[in-house]
Amino acid sequence: MRKLFTSIYLWGIVIISFCSHTTNAQQLLNPRLQPQFVNQLPVPGVINGLSGGTFNINIRQFDQWLGLVDPITKQHLNTTVWGYNGSYPGPTIVAKKDIPISVYWHNNLVNGSNQPLPHLLPIDRSIHWAFGHDPNWQSYGVPVVTHVHGGHTESASDGLPDQWFTPDFAMKGPGFIKGDAQPFYYHNDQEAATIWYHDHALGVTRLNVYAGLAGYYIITDQNEMNLQAANNLPAAPYDLGLAIQDRMFTSSGQLYYPSTSEEEEEEEVPYPSILPEMFGDFILVNGMTWPVLDVEPRQYRFRVLNGSDSRFYNLFFSSGEQFIQIGSDQGLLPSPFTTNQMLIAPGERKDIIIDFSNPALWGQTIILKNNAKTPYPKGSAPDPLTTGRIMAFRINKPLDESYPLTTLPATLRPPIVPLQTELAPRKLILFEAEDEYGRLMPILGTVDDGILGFRDPVTENPAMNSTEIWEMYNETMDA
């Protein structure tokens, strides 16, 4: 053990070996024996909220083909997943600035007899989670609550971890306010941006999202619509989301989430046990393993989301093609900029343009690759044959001249006025401590107070409409 910060003792990062295809007596699919760049990129359906309205979105369990095959028979292997409105990823919600929408999120994780379904993945009940140590927890069903990540949302509709609920609202978290009698309300009072929605239930967020509960939430505004109308930005069908996620699968094609580490197998820790980080050995984009997209010789807009648990991606093209970044988490950049590679962290979004119009690309297949280490930035390099590959693009479709070509402008938005503040910066710290079982535990704190738990009194209470500077100090081994 090494003392790193104010009496905090840190473990070395737990790194799980995924070279073996047997984990805890569970046979796993070998990613090297699965097809790549054969199956077309799926495009989720759309919920059109441009004119406002109230929508019902159902969370259900179903089987979906994610591109997996039996390595011997080559027969398709379907995977049981969860999704919104029967889709993984969920449908893309499209809204417009200052036009609110309301959503009833229905927890329909029940069987044909309307009985609650068990979770698809092992739950560690030793951590702070929805049902605590209640011995009857399995009879209640799976807790869920949806959070719009990046949205400017009222607290009652924010999908806070304690706002969870089970099927038919039989059980509700202590923070539950809306969902049954009242829908979640989204003001959409922010500029055009690529944000996303995902489950956020206490203690099982990682598992519920891994099971499939995520989707895009796109906000547009008049500035962006003007750019599209002037053919300065690609619009549908040349405006697509790319949600990148890593997963592991059993030999029968079912989702697998590690529930103990090699280090913990010889120690007295609960089983199943939470892990501080999880890195899958399959890469999926929009719910398909290593897909391909056939494209025309023109500009495409891709809204890239890193929907993985812990994995960073440093993206680059096998052909050396460049990315033109036009937006980030919260909206359009002041002007486009060009780069040969693009780093994207879990939960982050990057809005990019790829120009396939170069005549030298016609008839070619180019591969989107990844070279980010796991854990980032000091861990192991990805397998160049699996996790080092994301998807492929085939430049083989004839140009559809009914859609005009686009030309990026020099500026994308009005200038951003720098914010000023005379308030002292708030200084917060990211720690890695140990829990009562000796497991690595990411946790927050402040420079003045050190480590703070979930139930500790609030320390950061900025005034409404104030401007502050928050300084984040990373004391973890990944820094």
Spans of features found by a protein language model:
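Short, acidic/polar linear motifs in exposed loop/turn regions
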Residues: 109, 205, 308-310, 476-478
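A conserved hydrophobic secondary-structure block that centers on an alpha-helix together
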Residues: 171-208
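N-terminal signal peptide c-region/cleavage motif recognized by signal peptidases
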Residues: 20-22
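Bacterial N-terminal signal peptides that target proteins for export
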Residues: 1-10
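N-terminal, post-signal-peptide metal-ligating segments of extracellular/periplasmic oxidoreductases
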Residues: 25-148, 152-172, 181, 266-302, ...
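Short Pro-Gly-centered flexible turn/kink motifs
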Residues: 101-103, 175-183, 345-354
